[in-house]
């Protein structure tokens, strides 16, 4: 075991979390991380490595076009992949303001679908993955199929079953 990133890059707080690795078409190891800028807004950092023994290179932030990042302080559990020829980004934007028909909960599981060009996702569609109250922090794994899983139950909430020491 070794630490591959021992501090946040310049311009970011130490609130960096949830690395999600994947292999690029060129055979590079790339990973995305949720991060917080020094101005306390959330983002996603993209790193790349040639192999497991190399030092990660910061490629920059992932830009999701047309996503209102106002008041968002952290992008938790980022996941970036291609599906059916489209770029897909799944994340949980903490602090997202409520909108008329979506983002009504305290915590959200969100996806953006579009064309991925370098570190820019030209999103054609941005929406919550689930409009219920208890689905959060989704991630995917892939073998022959891509499987999505996430939390059932949210932090910082009181549930009626808490008195029985059962939650989610």
Regions flagged by a language model, labelled:
Residues 1-168:
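Carbohydrate-active catalytic/glycan-binding domains of CAZyme proteins
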């Amino acid at each position: 075991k070794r630490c591959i990133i021992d501090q946040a890059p310049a311009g970011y707080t130490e609130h960096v979390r949830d690395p999600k690795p994947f292999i690029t078409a060129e055979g590079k190891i790339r990973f995305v991380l949720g991060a917080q800028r020094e101005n306390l807004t959330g983002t996603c950092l993209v790193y790349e490595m040639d192999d497991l023994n190399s030092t990660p290179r910061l490629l920059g932030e992932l830009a999701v076009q047309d996503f209102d990042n106002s008041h968002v302080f952290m992008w938790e559990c980022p996941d970036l992949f291609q599906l059916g020829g489209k770029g897909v980004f799944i994340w949980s934007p903490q602090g997202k303001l409520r909108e008329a028909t979506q983002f009504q909960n305290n915590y959200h599981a969100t996806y953006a679908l579009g064309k991925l060009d370098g570190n820019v996702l030209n999103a054609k569609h941005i929406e919550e993955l689930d409009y219920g109250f208890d689905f959060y922090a989704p991630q995917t794994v892939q073998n022959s199929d891509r499987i999505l899983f996430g939390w059932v139950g949210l932090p910082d909430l009181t549930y009626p079953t808490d008195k029985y020491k059962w939650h989610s």
